Amino acid sequence: MRILAVILALLLSAGSAIAVEKITPRQAHEAVGEGGLVLVDIRTPEEWAETGIPEPATPIDMTSADFVPKLKELLTGNPGRTVGFICRTGNRSNYLTEVLEKAGLTNIVDVTGGVAGNGKVTGWIAEGLPMKQHCETC
């Protein structure tokens, strides 16, 4: 993960640091529906196959070698929009958003509770939010 932090720090443009906002899966779903949020599922392909992917999240495996280029492409294609990151329980998305914030990225949110929930926050699935069961790009 340290390598990821260094790569992101070098590749992402600098900006003023702000605290990363945290939202629930339901809030993320509503923000996506209103057009104000682009949702990124940062779990692994194995996890995507097991549960499906939140609708309409873009799957980008945060452990893959092409994570940074794919994220940069997504950011470039969605200027001015907030990007929300979701994982299984909220741990990885919390870590990633902290790293991205330290690298200077703004307009990002952490979707707490993730897809499965974490005992404190109900996850995307338990909230009954829509899931794609088959991922053609995973």
Regions found by a protein language model. Give the residues of each.
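Structural scaffold elements adjacent to functional motifs in cytosolic proteins
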Residues: 39-41
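Rhodanese-like catalytic fold shared by cysteine-dependent sulfurtransferases
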Residues: 17-34, 45-82, 91-138
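Bacterial N-terminal signal peptides
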Residues: 2-15
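Short, surface-exposed ligand- or partner-binding patches at beta-edge/loop junctions that are enriched
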Residues: 86
